[in-house]
């Protein structure tokens, strides 16, 4: 199956079990519930996630850059499956009013990122 491309689209209440080989550019995800979803070979470039709840999501060979996370809840997410993480290409552009529980951000070079409007519980930030 060929790679799917989405530009400027809005996805409301999407709850995939598996998402593979898709590129999302400047898309908006609203009220999306990703519970145990497996996300492979996908790109999220300049996307906004608003009032989304993710739990046990696994990223493999994925890329995220300049994503806005607004009023979201993330539980048990290992963000390490995102490729292209560096001081120059940040996965997150903004995070406001988000709750992170049991997340792992290891090796993501997030020292300059402002998470001050978010809450955290039992998260790991090794080598950030």
Where would I find each of the regions flagged by the language model?
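Tandem repeat scaffolds
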Residues: 1-128
């Amino acid at each position: 199956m060929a790679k799917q491309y989405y530009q400027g689209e809005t996805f409301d209440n999407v709850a995939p079990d598996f998402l593979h080989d898709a590129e999302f550019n400047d898309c908006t995800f609203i009220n999306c519930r990703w519970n145990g979803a497996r996300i492979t070979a996908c790109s999220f470039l300049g996307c906004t996630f608003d009032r989304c709840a993710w739990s046990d999501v696994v990223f493999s060979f994925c890329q995220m850059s300049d994503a806005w996370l607004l009023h979201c809840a993330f539980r048990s997410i290992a963000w390490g499956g995102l490729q292209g993480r560096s001081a120059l290409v940040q996965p997150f552009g903004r995070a406001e009013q988000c709750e992170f529980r049991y997340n792992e951000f290891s090796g993501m070079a997030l020292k300059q990122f402002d998470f001050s409007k978010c809450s955290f519980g039992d998260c790991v930030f090794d080598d950030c």
